[in-house]
């Protein structure tokens, strides 16, 4: 009997020892926040919605490639491997593994994920949090407008997915547009989005009028033209926006935050990161390749240090001419003229 008691005591002591060791090893990780305990303060809400703004700017470059090179407005030319990559889009000879397509698709869903995080975890007990929630709905809707218009039936993801939900089927177009309409309508009617105070005032945040403009755009895609006219008229009649008179500088730093701009991504200028700077990227991608031009030195007073990925088509040029539009033509399409002189001196 005594041996049994001793054995039982040893077993009990052993269990207690291992249990206490496990407790010592089960230590909360320092410096790590969980979804459940992070999104509590206004500062947390600001950090969460900033992720939407940050991810959105990463959609611009691939979207610029796809939307322009798949259109009738321009074509790509050149012999480098990067130009050849652009030509795949221009000639519709790309496949589903094409990098710009994959990048845009992925980055749009990154925005949706960030928006879903805000809507899932940020509360509604302060003005800052309510604004973040309204902005998140606009970002989610804006991303889906891009996805639906380019892919047709992308997966509908309206919440942060669990591991067993990662494999999503194609979405239903009507359900997708319904989510877009709902998100934008709720954001507009919430009263929580910022608004410009005057024509010359500008905010880099999502505004009520920008959400209305997106809703109008969504209605156009859905061919609900009457609803589109109504909501777009509200933007015009707000008196907070107008056409920018200095058209030739609308895409330059001089034209930043102008009265025509509804929304701009704000970013830090970095001269060493050309493709990360949107205005620089447009200039470099679109402008002439100087090494491919046959002209004499005097004409190099004109800027020509681009890569030549995007060249306007003759049809695009003719459209400007047929409308008698000279100021927008001259600001949109750069032309090289040569004289009939014997020495071929450019004029």
Can you say where each PLM-predicted feature lies in the sequence?
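Bacterial N-terminal signal peptides
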Residues: 9-16
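Single conserved hydrophobic/aromatic residue that forms the stacking wall/gate
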Residues: 337-347
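Bacterial N-terminal signal peptides that target proteins for export
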Residues: 1-7
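An aromatic- and glycine-enriched ligand-binding surface/loop that stacks and positions planar moieties
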Residues: 22-81, 185-186, 205-339
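Short linear capping/connector segments at secondary-structure termini
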Residues: 30-34, 93-96, 158-165, 199-200
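C-terminal motif of bacterial Sec signal peptides marking the signal peptidase cleavage site
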Residues: 18-20
